[in-house]
Amino acid sequence: DPKTGVWAECPGYSNVVLNDYTSFATLFDRNLNYDLVKAMPVLSKAVAATPQYLFPNRMICGFGDTHPGYLNTNPISRMIRNAQHNGKKEQEEYFTAMLKCFHPDAGKTKDNKKSVPVSINSFFDEKPLELNPNIEAGKIEQYVSPFFYAPNVSWLVQRNGMNPRNSLMISLNASEGNHMHANGISMELYGKGYVLAPDAGIGLYLYSGLDYLEYYSQFPSHNTVCVDGISSYPVMKSNHSFDLKSSFPVSSEPGKAFTSVTYS
């Protein structure tokens, strides 16, 4: 989405797509000296938007075919590589601070040049990332919004802070986009350090357990699996979104001051 940077799938698949896009852009830039991030600025916007998926405990929302986990920071690293390769200081500062926030050990010993194995792949793989030591880690509040709404996946978030213990949050999702399922509205709550009523996501056994089969209307069947020889799209990629009539606060820009009350 050019306005929000959110890919039109659930968080689990969105992060995979973003990882692949940024990986290709890095490869393209390094070997052909063509800046795809400049040509497609929505890429950097998409990377900057990924923290919006986070609960105050730093784990991502689990709606749709998603397994809750932590943020993949590889796309952030690649935005830094892109900035360094093309002399974009402002972009380097922004994403370096973000990377140090979500991955404090990035660029340290395990990423050191000495740890790179001697291999033919070293001619093609990404080289160890060197971070500017003068750039300090950002604060997580700089990268999330008190209120965030992505209509292309019919998903909104309200939060009053990012304190793992004391902050509250709600993640509300209908069914719009891919891997979302047409079985109503998903609502995940957060309080006292816990995700309350977490979405079942892809289930305990990654699509193959009864918890997945009995929660959703069918197994995934438009991707690589055909159930009873029939593959159907309407259940997995549906168009059953909710309409956001009003909200407070209005702005969804990250870094805005949190309010004690939010409304939608």
Question: Which positions does each model-derived feature cover?
Answer:
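Extended polysaccharide-engagement surfaces of secreted carbohydrate-active enzymes
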Residues: 8-264
